[in-house]
């Protein structure tokens, strides 16, 4: 028998899993997502989340509580009489009453190989740390932060040029397949659960605005990982004097290079930049309010001479 489930998610990352579960024939009684947020060019329009929009296209009822502090919201959740809740990047903490509010509990699709990178930003943190492998896991949620027992996992390699946006899109698809398999096994009573390892725990803290600035005093490999781990969003950046004023420039892609100089020194006409150790080459950049451009195109509109300093 197909499962009766509640789906909980918010960003684009969650949508393929919602679509896959619906396509597998499960009865999705309701979708929970974060409330509409101000958006549009002036921030005056309320914009529904990608999951909200997908659920409406599927004809599934959508609920958008700001939290579950209200007893009425917790009761509404239980009243759906669901077998299971599937959670993928929902963005809200779930109280115990919700975690135990369905027959089989809540199963989460998490974008790392736990216990490494528990928390809010596992995709970015894996690349920023220079990891060569990550993956998706389906786990049964408990009261801790991504500490529940693991049901299924699939690893995904990270090559030295992969950026966070590419890894996001890969894991988004892997996660949909993995969760669909997990729910099929849960339905048949054959879903295994194993406790997470006690060793290798790392936390993927939310990316702060302060750490997005590029620190060229770090070794080139770390600078390169920093850039690709934050691309395309929120974007690593440096400041540059343009037409007499200081302007922020995002770096969306880079590669390892050769050369020596003071950290932040422009080494050549192709944007080789000296780091604390070694050098990186900036290959895709974006000025505030402008389009993302290949380095050669960027330099045609914004010349940066060899010997200049960026920081």
Curated annotation (Swiss-Prot):
UniProt binding sites for (6S)-5,6,7,8-tetrahydrofolate: 112-115
Coiled coil: none
Enzyme Commission designation: 2.1.2.9
GO cellular component: cytosol
Entry keyword set: Protein biosynthesis, Transferase
Span of the signal peptide: none
One matching Pfam family: Formyl_trans_N
Xref: InterPro entries: Fmt, Formyl_trans_C, Formyl_transf_N, Formyl_transf_N_sf, Formyl_transferase-like_C_sf, GART_AS, Met-tRNA-FMT_C, Met-tRNA-FMT_N
Catalytic activity: L-methionyl-tRNA(fMet) + (6R)-10-formyltetrahydrofolate = N-formyl-L-methionyl-tRNA(fMet) + (6S)-5,6,7,8-tetrahydrofolate + H(+)
PROSITE patterns, alphabetized: GART
Spans traversing the lipid bilayer: none
Keyword Repressor applies: no
GO MF, any single term: methionyl-tRNA formyltransferase activity
CDD domains noted in UniProt: FMT_core_Met-tRNA-FMT_N, Met_tRNA_FMT_C
Function: Attaches a formyl group to the free amino group of methionyl-tRNA(fMet). The formyl group appears to play a dual role in the initiator identity of N-formylmethionyl-tRNA by promoting its recognition by IF2 and preventing the misappropriation of this tRNA by the elongation apparatus.
Sequence similarity: Belongs to the Fmt family.
Protein's recorded name: Methionyl-tRNA formyltransferase
Species of provenance: Rhizobium meliloti (strain 1021) (Ensifer meliloti)
């Amino acid at each position: 028998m197909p499962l009766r489930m509640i789906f909980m998610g918010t960003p684009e990352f969650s949508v393929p899993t919602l679509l896959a579960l619906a396509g597998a024939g499960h009865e999705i009684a309701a979708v929970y997502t974060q409330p509409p947020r101000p958006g549009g060019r002036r921030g005056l329009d309320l914009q529904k989340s990608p999951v909200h929009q997908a659920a409406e296209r599927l004809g599934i009822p959508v609920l958008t509580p700001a939290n579950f502090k209200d007893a009425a919201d917790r009761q509404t959740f239980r009243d759906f009489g669901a077998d299971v809740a599937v959670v993928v990047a929902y963005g809200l903490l779930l109280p115990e009453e919700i975690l135990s509010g369905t027959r089989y509990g809540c199963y989460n699709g998490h974008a790392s190989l736990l216990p490494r990178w528990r928390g809010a930003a596992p995709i970015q943190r894996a690349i920023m740390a220079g990891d060569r492998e990550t993956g998706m896991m389906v786990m049964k949620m408990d009261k801790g932060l991504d500490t529940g027992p693991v049901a299924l996992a699939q690893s995904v390699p990270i090559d030295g040029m992969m950026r966070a946006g590419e890894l996001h899109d890969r894991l988004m698809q892997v996660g949909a397949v993995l969760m669909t398999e997990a729910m099929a096994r849960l339905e048949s009573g054959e879903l295994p659960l194993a406790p997470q390892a006690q060793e290798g725990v790392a936390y993927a803290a939310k990316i702060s605005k302060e750490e997005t600035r590029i620190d060229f005093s770090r070794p080139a490999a770390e600078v390169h990982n920093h850039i690709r781990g934050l691309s395309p969003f929120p974007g690593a950046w440096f400041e540059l004097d343009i037409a007499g004023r200081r302007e922020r420039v995002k770096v969306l892609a880079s590669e390892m290079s050769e050369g020596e100089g003071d950290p932040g020194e422009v080494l050549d006409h192709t944007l080789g930049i000296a780091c604390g150790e070694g050098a990186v080459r900036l290959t895709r950049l974006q000025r505030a309010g402008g389009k993302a451009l290949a380095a050669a195109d960027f330099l045609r509109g914004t010349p940066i001479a060899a010997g200049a300093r960026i920081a």
